[in-house]
Amino acid sequence: MALPMVHLLVAERWARNHPQYAQNAGFYLGAISPDAIHIRDHDDKSHKNYVHLNNWMALHPDEVIAYWRKRSAPFDIGYGIHVLTDALWVRARLEQLPQLNLPDGSLDKEKYYRDTFLTDFELYRDGGEALFRKMGEGKAPSDHPLLTQEEFAQWQHDVLKAYRGKCPKTGRAEYITCAYARRFVEECQKELDSIYGRFEK
């Protein structure tokens, strides 16, 4: 449930160790593209785990590896990095930020989305435009098994437009701050590398 700027920062950091992807626009487009399900379903999240290869809320790396073994273009590698990042993001939040849970154990969505939007837009303003330009040059595949090329392209357009505008939240991030997000970007790399290494074998 990370937002686009965090996904792009994770992808960029991961690509330092996998330089064949570092300048590939399709890889960066893939790194935001599982969330193109919102073009189809809007706020209905009933299909989100499916298009996230069963990694939306919990880590299931075998399903990403199986996907990569069928599809391994740069776009698809980025797609897999996105869904793994979401699973690791949720795990980190549950372990490190119990303050974002309501008394019944569910997520306090008001606090969560305030923080994630404020922080993601701040990260974008702090040098994110270059990554967005690179992502904006990417071309989505026409034969993806889960989402259409048109859905990917519309999501790409909508994300670019949104971040070049005004953040929908106001105030100051309290828990998911830029420091928290940047630390996550670093801390998730070892596990991402390990999973990708299993695919490469």
Residue ranges, per PLM feature:
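N-terminal leader/auxiliary helical segments
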Residues: 1-201
